[in-house]
Amino acid sequence: MDNTFGKDVKIYKDAFIRASKIKDHAVIGDDCFITDSTIGEYSTIERRGMIFNSTIENYSYTGYNTVVKYASIGKFCSISWNVSIGGANHDVHHLTTHPFPFISKYGFANENTSYESFNDILKIGNDVWIGSNVCILRGVTIGNGAVIGAGAVVTHDVGPYEIWAGVPAKKIGKRFDDKIIEHLFKCSNRGGVVRPAYRIFKRKPVYVQRKCNP
């Protein structure tokens, strides 16, 4: 499969891109490695980012040294540096956690067989903020508007607009009360950010709530 590039895409030195779709106005930093993935409009992959078999939607960005594998990431996500999203699983119920019985290159198996290391779905919603040095395991879903504190290891689903931190990560709060969250969902269901109204996102939630009423 060939690459597809939109208009005004910026690709910096020594970036490697294979079988991927890079949409309009996206930015790919130095020494990035992107394969079998889609990078949305106005999205940025900072230097030394590695994206495998994933979709990153419009207006999202990843910091340097961040790795994303077999994941779906929504719009307007802010992902910091040194983040690991969707690393391979190792089955702790086998006699060994090493994949040598499944992969021929180690000299034991005659042929490669499925290890199912990426089968569990990993999905990150819209407007999610992920701090530096976070690790998000496979099988996790992170809801819209959630915040993950720096250094967290996320092993369970995170609800919309929840704040999680720690090792393992635990819920420590919510960004807004339930009424405001309900209004935010109504806004998003009407089509997301309308460009002429983008300034309301600089305001406090009570202002957003008033603007989003039918």
Language-model regions, residue ranges each:
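Short-chain dehydrogenase/reductase
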Residues: 129, 147, 163-164
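Conserved sequence/active-site signature of Rossmann-fold short-chain dehydrogenase/reductase
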Residues: 84-85, 153, 163
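Conserved catalytic segment of ABC-fold P-loop ATPases
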Residues: 143-146, 159-161
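C-terminal segments of enzyme domains that contribute to small-molecule binding surfaces
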Residues: 93-137, 167-214
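A generic "structured core" feature
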Residues: 147-149, 153
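Basic (Lys/Arg-enriched) interaction patch that binds polyanionic ligands
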Residues: 139-142, 156
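Flexible, glycine/small-residue-enriched loop-and-beta-strand segment within the central core
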Residues: 2, 13-138
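Acidic, glycine-centered active-site loop in nucleotide-sugar glycosyltransferases
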Residues: 160, 165-168
